[in-house]
Every structure is written in structure tokens, then in C-alpha cells.
């Protein structure tokens, strides 16, 4: 919709007997926006009666402070739903490539039939260690919030349109084609997100160490000066 959020009513209207699955990423990538828990829960309950609903909660951990409850509770209630999580985001294990899904036993069994290989032991132990490291989790959450707030203030100062984020990035409107913007930033030693059609004049910028985020801010101000 105009706020770059899912139009769940329109999605519901398009579901038919030929629909194999409905996929929802919440919080969403690349917009960073989030569908409210009650709205999404009602949608999942209704739609899962017609087809399987896959809810990607890769950025769920960043939305905890915003009061977003997971849709895993619907799995426990027996609804035809799959919920996925990853250790690639707040846990910092992107290179390890490990995550998990939550669904009913029959659905899990059918998915396992399509699995190419099992998870290696290094990834498994790394995930367990990361999950148990609650201090690092809190540290990551706080550092991400610090960078997100810096972005908000930066875009407000430059009068740039953006969307409030519930992830580890912010989606903002550059006013120019992303290829031109990306080329400029690359020349300054900064890599920004790829194009996300049809939003060719929007950019997804990720958080990082606050000192690095501030360097981006300096170069962004130069771009619009």
C-alpha cells in the first residue's frame, strides 16, 4: 500500500483453489515495515483454511521492542502455517547459513523430503552458542537501535522520505535512480542495497557500527549538497 505495507485484504481476494502457498515476510524486506500482530493473525487464520501460509520472521528479533508476537502460536493451535527464523541477522551468523522452521509434523516431514543436505556441526554448535549468549543479543539490539535512530535523524535533516523500520536497515527515497546513487556511494567506499523494483529511486541501507554509519551520513550530505 502507500505506506509500503502488505495489503492483506487484496492478497486475500487473490487467493484461489490454485494458490499453493501465500508468503508473508514480517517485518518486511526491503521496506522494513511491519503488519500489526492482530491484523496478521486474523489474516493467517483465515487464509490458512484455504492454503498454506508461510510467515518469514527473519527480522522478528528486531521487532521485539515493538511488541510484535510471533505467529508460532498459530502453529501450536493447528493452523496450516509455516514460520521461519534465521541466525543470519541479530545473531551475526550470516556466513554460517543456519536457520529453522516451525510447522506441524506432517508439513515438516514433506519439507524434509526436499532437503538437499543436513546442517553441518559447525553451524549447529555456533547457533546454539549464539542463542545462549543473551548479553550479545541485547548488545546487538541496542547497537542496532542506535544506528536506526541516527538514520531517522539524518533523513529528517535532509528532508528525505523514509519508512520507520522494524529491522536492521532503513528504506529511504533517494530521489534519483538507485544505480546512480549506488555508483556515487561506491566511489566513496560505501556499498548500498541493490535495486528493488519498482522502487528504483529508493535505497535500503543497513545498520552497522555507529562510526561507519556516521561516515555514510557524511557522504549522503555531500551527495545532496
Located regions from the model:
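Hydrophobic residues in well-ordered beta-strands that form the structural core
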Residues: 55, 83, 119, 192-194
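Conserved PLP-binding catalytic core of the aspartate aminotransferase-like
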Residues: 145, 155-188, 207
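Active-site pre-lysine segment of PLP-dependent enzymes
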Residues: 5-18, 30-53, 57-90
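Short acidic/glycine-enriched loop/turn segments that link adjacent beta-strands
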Residues: 95, 166-167, 198-201
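PLP-dependent aminotransferase class I/II
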Residues: 80-156, 160-163
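PLP-dependent enzyme catalytic core of the Aspartate aminotransferase-like
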Residues: 38, 42, 183-188, 192, ...
Amino acid at each position: 500500500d502507500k505506506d509500503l505495507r502488505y495489503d492483506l485484504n487484496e492478497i486475500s481476494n487473490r487467493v484461489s483453489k490454485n494458490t499453493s502457498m501465500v508468503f508473508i515476510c514480517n517485518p518486511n524486506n526491503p521496506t522494513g515495515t511491519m503488519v500489526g500482530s492482530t491484523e496478521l493473525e486474523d489474516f493467517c487464520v483465515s487464509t490458512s483454511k484455504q492454503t498454506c501460509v508461510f510467515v518469514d520472521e527473519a527480522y522478528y528479533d528486531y521487532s521485539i521492542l515493538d511488541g510484535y508476537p510471533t505467529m508460532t502460536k498459530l502453529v501450536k493451535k493447528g493452523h496450516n502455517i509455516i514460520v521461519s527464523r534465521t541466525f543470519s541477522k541479530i545473531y551475526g551468523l550470516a556466513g554460517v547459513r543456519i536457520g529453522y522452521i516451525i510447522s506441524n509434523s506432517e508439513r515438516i516431514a514433506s519439507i524434509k523430503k526436499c532437503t538437499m543436505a543436513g546442517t553441518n556441526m559447525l553451524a549447529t554448535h555456533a547457533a546454539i552458542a549464539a542463542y545462549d549468549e543473551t548479553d550479545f543479543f541485547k548488545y546487538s539490539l541496542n547497537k542496532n537501535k542506535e544506528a536506526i535512530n541516527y538514520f531517522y535523524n539524518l533523513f529528517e535533516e535532509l528532508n528525505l522520505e523514509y519508512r520507520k523500520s522494524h529491522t536492521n536497515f532503513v528504506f529511504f527515497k533517494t530521489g534519483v535512480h538507485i544505480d546512480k546513487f549506488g555508483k556515487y556511494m561506491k566511489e566513496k567506499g560505501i556499498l548500498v542495497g541493490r535495486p528493488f523494483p519498482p522502487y528504483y529511486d529508493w535505497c535500503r541501507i543497513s545498520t552497522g557500527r555507529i562510526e561507519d554509519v556516521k561516515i555514510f551520513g557524511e557522504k549522503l550530505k555531500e551527495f545532496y549538497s
